[in-house]
Design a protein with these regions (language model features):
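Conserved catalytic cores of very large enzyme subunits
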Residues: 1-426
Length: 426
């Protein structure tokens, strides 16, 4: 199991000078001379104005090992200064001056289904959320769905925050980390982390309801059990503002609702779009969605577009994610992309140069985070079927904010990784 140790290299100082050292190169080089490793979670604090040779070396290591995540120093530095660390997966924190109350995530995809069904849970066949009145019409109306979804999110935010308040209070009571807190300044800044799961499915579902016609298929009790989409609709992940503006609205709205509630020890509420591998578990309890996602299957991870939604290539997908403002998700916006080596170029040098150009463009648009995997799906399938092969004993992949040995994942998690989009074109 991960110990969540993260190592940061690179970054730009407040005075404008880069902070790349020879030791940064040495740390990165261990991934070549000692082999890929999930931990420490190797994180490059990226900025387009970092030394060109350093950016190329990072890209070279990414292509060779798929073991690096990149985070945008240009958006984090104004918030956290130039002496910050990455905790857990992608969350920035001022080193030695603050701590974070970890908050897992809320399943907004299931919340949307609650809104449609008046709070009724199809999985457990019981009333869970407040009964706002189920939608009885044959086709879903966008304004009606959004109104009920807004009420459901308000209820969920309150339940979420108050549950976390209880957890953090009891944790401090019975398991206060005194030795760790001794290393932090006396006047501690505390942040209250929350998170979002099912993000892209909610965005695509709202797009389907707004721009196409979504017919409701009901069960024997009259609840919406499935949906039939008539017509085309924009999907998040294709650089289409019709979908991407809904994505920004969803992130901003949920954070605003979180801020309506008192947080433990007056900590500052933040949120993230980060699921690690919990997207598989959340999916087991989430029914059919209006975007076409089937019941009980994994949700798309983090801020990634839904599986199969990206139809316009890698660059368009990155542009969509880059539109999500970091200020609304200071706990992190995790984006994991898998690129076929042939899509990046026909030689190591070409792949390295193209990846640097992709990173420069992506982060110059204000994006926060990127996991880079460079391999084809056939390699994943072979590793799943033949984990005993020597070449797979240390086969490391980026998942969602952290790295893991592929053969250490459960088969269910491996199948989820395999089902994710592998970009064949830029």
């Amino acid at each position: 199991d991960p110990v969540w140790a993260t190592l940061e290299v690179g970054g730009i100082g407040q005075d404008g000078r880069h902070m790349v050292t020879k030791t940064d190169y040495r740390f990165l080089h261990t991934l070549e001379n000692m082999g890929p490793s999930p931990e420490p979670n190797m994180t490059v604090l990226y900025a387009p104005r970092l030394p060109e040779n350093f950016k190329k070396y990072c890209a070279h290591i990414s292509v060779a090992t798929s073991s690096i995540q990149y985070e945008n120093d240009e958006v984090m530095r104004p918030v956290w200064g130039d002496d910050y660390s990455i905790c857990c997966c992608v969350s920035a924190t001022q080193t030695g001056k603050e701590m974070q109350f970890f908050g897992a995530r809320a399943n907004l995809a299931k919340a949307l289904l609650y809104a449609i069904n008046g709070g009724w849970d199809l999985k457990h066949q019981e009333q869970v959320a407040p009964n706002t009145g189920r939608i009885e019409t044959e086709y879903l109306d966008y304004d009606q769905v959004q109104e009920k979804f807004d009420l459901t999110m308000e209820w969920l935010a309150g339940l979420y925050v108050n549950t976390l308040n209880l957890i953090h209070y009891m944790h401090d009571k019975y398991y206060y980390e005194a030795s760790q807190m001794a290393l932090i300044d006396t006047n501690v800044r505390r942040t209250f982390a929350t998170g979002i799961a099912g993000f892209s499915h909610v965005v695509d579902s709202l797009c389907a309801i707004r721009y196409a016609k979504v017919k409701v298929i009901r069960d024997e009790n009259g609840y919406a059990a499935d949906f039939q989409v008539e017509g085309d609709f924009p999907r998040y992940g294709n650089d289409d503002d019709r979908a991407d503006t809904i994505a920004v609205w969803l992130l901003r709205t949920f954070l605003e609702k979180i801020k309506h509630y008192h947080t433990y020890r007056d900590s500052e509420p933040t949120t993230s779009i980060l699921t690690i591998t919990s997207n598989v578990v959340y999916g087991k309890y989430t029914g059919n969605m209006p975007d076409g996602r089937r019941a009980w299957t994994p949700l798309a991870p983090g801020a990634n577009p839904s599986y199969g939604a990206e139809q316009s290539g890698l660059i368009a997908s990155l542009n969509s994610v880059a539109k999500l403002p970091y200020q609304y998700a200071l706990d992190g916006i995790s984006n994991t992309q898998t690129i076929n080596p042939g899509a990046l170029g026909h030689s190591d040098r070409e792949r390295t140069e193209n990846l640097v150009n992709i990173l420069d463009g992506y982060f110059s648009r204000g994006a926060h985070h990127l996991n880079v995997n460079v391999f084809g799906k056939e390699m994943l399938v072979d590793a799943m079927e033949h984990p005993e092969k020597p070449e797979y004993q240390n086969f490391t992949i980026r998942v969602s904010g952290y790295a893991v040995k592929f053969i250490d994942l459960t088969r269910e998690q491996q199948l989820d990784v395999i089902s994710r989009t592998c970009h064949e074109t830029l």
